[in-house]
Amino acid sequence: MKISLIISTYNRPEALRLSLMSAKVQTRIPDEVIIADDGSKENTRELIKNFAKDFPCPILHAWQEDKGFRLAESRNNALRMAHGDYIVFIDGDIIMERHFIADHERLAEKGYFVIGSR
């Protein structure tokens, strides 16, 4: 199963850095990470570019112009870029437990949509 991890963000590069660090050490690395960016400034773009240099899977940056809070639209933009059979959405301030992606893969069932909260 090919897994796409979509991480939403907006001008919180330090939180995104921690989230990406947790993605990098997963026991099951996602096949791609897509950053759903709702118009962050250049420092977020630089952070993503630096992480992409030695990340264990491709990192894509789905940026949209900042026109106010448009989280759903930014997630949809990222979803259009995804190649995974299974999509995991998280917010950019989530630090994943190291088995987070592996647990999703193990528990995935065709035809189901699962949502959770903190």
Model-based region annotation:
Residues 65-82, 99:
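Glycine-rich, basic loop-to-helix element that forms the pyrophosphate-binding segment
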